[in-house]
Amino acid sequence: MSTFDQNSLLLLSSILVPLMVGAFLLFGAFLNKATRCWISALGFGYPLVVAVLLACFFEANPGAYNYELCLPTGLQSIGIYLHLGLNAVSMPLFLLAGIVGFSAGVYAIFSQVDRSHVYLALLLFMLSGLLGTFASVDIFFFYFFHEFALIPTFIMIGIWGGSNRRIVALQMTIYLTLGAMLSLLGLIALYISSGAQSFSLLELRSYLVANPLSQTVQNNVFGLLLFGFGILVSLFPFHSWAPKGYASAPTGAAMLHAGVLKKFGLYGLLQLGWPLLPLGAIHWFPWIIWLALANILIIGLITIAQRDVKLMLGYSSVMHMGYAFLGIATFSVVGAGGVLLLLLAHGLSVALLFMLSTCIYQRTLTLNMQHMGGLATQAPILGAFFIAATMASIGLPGFGNFWGEFTIFVALAESAPTRWVVLPAAIGIIISAIYGLRASANIFFGQPRGGFTERLQSGLIR
């Protein structure tokens, strides 16, 4: 079905290398620290190099995939193949996974954690699953790789998470299992209803163009996908797992999940839901709009109330996914482009912020912003990076987040049914500015407060 050219084999190897390195590290307690670091660096660095190379040679053709590879799995009788490829929707997110995965890996390599070989192995498994998710053309493996990436997240929170890690891990498991089951039911219903003979997205698309599903079937299937994927993206009111999960998760897991894995649901709606079920998408349009606005306005106000840095970042991440859902609700190419740009920019900025928040904790021994102040005098470089990442996250002009949100606003304004949404959605910009500027001011400027003063004077803050 496809040729085994150099680039398609590179795509396959980018998934297999972190998987194999992770498996080796899992049983690598006998390795010394230096060897473990170099082997881990290979596992995290190789996918980044491949992702950059594939992005450089990528040719964007509507509906077409680059670097296609199709391998038998033993399940050909039911239409399941390991079918890989990248199109204009998946390529940016595949590159995002490579960048954030490498950053999280480097940070993890230099972190002091117990059983570091297991910790690094789980991160590599997570990265392999993420890359496989975005590279899969077969919807069976699209779902399989996502679940494969989720499992290490639960384990890492349960072992290396914060003081309430077991409760948080249980809550995440319940929510994300529910979302995964609903999305699985939606995918199965899509396959059965279509009557197609393959799980290949390309064949499903071709078949449904020639034989569109009825309005009722599209409504039901899209509803399953919307709420299944929505739970995985923390769509209101199914959001409560995300902020606590990110606050409790070890830094590497928080970077990969908030920065990349969380984008799975939105990617699924862009790649599957809207193109294959257009009538169902239109039917659920009011729900998408109102729930997205709830993400922006209600979660935005909750974000303002936070005093813990990581909880603030977690709620902020949930809030900004509302803009991505609004972009999908435009059902336009401009809106889809804005969503992709926002997902890419948000993934980079939120991953950096979670890493920097851990750096702040290591220097202050607290995450309570009310117990900080004046840190810029002791850590000016940390302050500069945190403020820059915060400004990017809240959508300051010049950063990628701004252009993503701006493009979504343009798409909303161009369509009469969504034009009214521009004003309430714009209130979220003010909300973002309030919590972002306040956090930067409380942490890095002003006078040190409380016990923070003694730690500054005693030199505990590096």
What is each stretch, according to the model?
Residues 31-33, 118-213, 217, 302-369:
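Alpha-helical multi-pass transmembrane bundles of energy-transducing inner-membrane proteins
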Residues 2-5, 131-137, 270-284, 324-342, ...:
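Helix-coil boundary and interhelical linker segments in multi-pass alpha-helical membrane proteins
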Residues 236, 350-356, 420-456:
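Predominantly late transmembrane helices and immediately cytosolic-facing juxtamembrane segments
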Residues 59-81, 180-239, 269-287, 335, ...:
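Juxtamembrane/interfacial segments at transmembrane-helix boundaries in multi-pass membrane proteins
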Residues 6-17, 86-97, 139-152, 218-231, ...:
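Structural signature of hydrophobic alpha-helical transmembrane segments
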Residues 22-32, 101-113, 155-164, 233-247, ...:
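C-terminal ends of transmembrane helices
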Residues 1-10, 24-121, 197-198, 202-206:
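Transmembrane helix-loop-helix hairpins at membrane boundaries of multipass inner-membrane proteins
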Residues 12-27, 41-54, 94-109, 126-127, ...:
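Central hydrophobic cores of alpha-helical transmembrane segments in multi-pass inner-membrane proteins
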